[in-house]
Each structure stands twice: as structure tokens, then as C-alpha cells.
């Protein structure tokens, strides 16, 4: 209730979502599949960045059709095709992280009677213990975040507005409204990659990113494995559509009937 994002919460939202989790939840639904980005520089990439994961994703879409859903291919999402302004998203990240981290740390230290009370104190601790805390990575983002001017900063507000517009009005809302869709289906992300202390992360893409930027709900369902690594399908919806997404996800989960158990790979060389 203290979250300002919930200030406009509709009064008719259900108090119990369990009745929406039905095995026939896909029947009659209209699911849109955004077309793969035309460029690696697209702001949001929904699929097309890992062949093995794409194949599993395609099989899951076929299963959704078998389950009674109308799957609409090549849905247009204008905001996704824009060249990314990484600086905008970084500005938002740093401002919000500084604000949230300071609030959390202050409350935690107050309750525990010990510990760092701010992001500045975390940075100072890391610096004082660099031989153990900063061996494998620095704290550049922490330092950039702590230098921000708060959530009333004009630059932050402008950057956030641009990010939200691309993900909402020109993104999820546009696609759902234009196609009369219940949700969008995207590849959640590529299979997990190995930790590489020399070259860094091998991050290929994440279909759910647009929902995170919009502040809209999403849910991911396990749909299979690639080289023993799990792959998921994410369903993205408009604001306050949790009931719809739970119904669709429950239907897909029941239809696939998978039981995927996590396990340690014996080596980074996967067959």
C-alpha cells in the first residue's frame, strides 16, 4: 500500500487469484508474438537471439495453439524497434537504485542496530576492504548511483518518461490494443551463460525487459531445455492484468506437463 505505483490500483481487483489458475486457461485467448527485432541495436529483443531457445519457443507456441489459443504472429511493437538510448535507462537505474538502496539500508540498520545505513557507507566499506570485496569487479555503478540528485531531479524525470513511453504507449499497450490481444508471448531469455571473469557476461537478450521498463506484470513458464539448461516463455500484459496472465500461464503449464529439475552441469562443455 505504501508503493506509489499502486496509487491508481483498480478497486475491483481480485483478492484471491487461485481461481484463475485453470488447466484450460488458454482456450479462447488471443496471444500476440512480437516480430523479432530487425536489428541487434533494437531497444527490446523478444526472440531471435539464440537458435536453440527459438526452437523450443516455437514448439511452445504450437502447443498454445493446440490448447485453444489464437496465436497472432509478427505483432508490431513500435517502441521495441527504436535505437536504444542506454543512457536514459542507466540514468533511471542509478537514480532509483540510490533512492531505494538508501531507504532499505537505513531501515535494515535501524531494525538490526548494526550495518551500513546508506549506499555511501557500502562504497566506503568496499573501498576499505578492496582486497576481498573488489577482487573480481569494481563498483563504478554504485559510485555513479550515489552521485545522483534524487527522484525530483529534472533529468531523471525526463529520462524515465522517455523510457516509459517506449515500453507502454508505444510498446505493450500499442500491441495489445491494436491486435485485440490478451497478452504477448516472448522468449524469456537465452539459456544461462558461464561466468567469465576475463570477458564478462555473454548476455544475448531478454524478452521480458519491456515489461520491466513499463512497470507492467509478466510471468514466465518453463517450456523446455537447451543443452540441459532451462528455457522459458514469458507472458506480458497491460497494467493490473495479473489475473489474465496467471490464467494463461496455468493453461500453458498444464498443457506442457513438464517437470524440469535444476541440476549442476558436470562441465561447461555441454552436449
For each feature predicted by the language model, list its residue ranges:
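A short helix-breaking turn/cap at a secondary-structure junction
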Residues: 1-55, 128, 254-271
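Acidic-enriched catalytic cores of C-N bond-cleaving enzymes acting on peptides and small amides
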Residues: 1-15, 43-82, 91-126
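Short, surface-exposed loop/helix-turn segments at secondary-structure junctions
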Residues: 11, 45, 157-158, 179, ...
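Short helix-loop capping/hinge segments that flank enzyme active sites or metal/cofactor-binding pockets
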Residues: 20, 25-43, 92-168, 173, ...
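Flexible loop/turn segments at secondary-structure boundaries
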Residues: 39-42, 79-83, 192-195, 227-229, ...
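Small-aliphatic-rich amphipathic alpha-helix that forms the alpha element of a beta-alpha
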Residues: 170-174, 197-222
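Short, well-ordered beta-strand elements
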Residues: 221, 229-238, 246-247
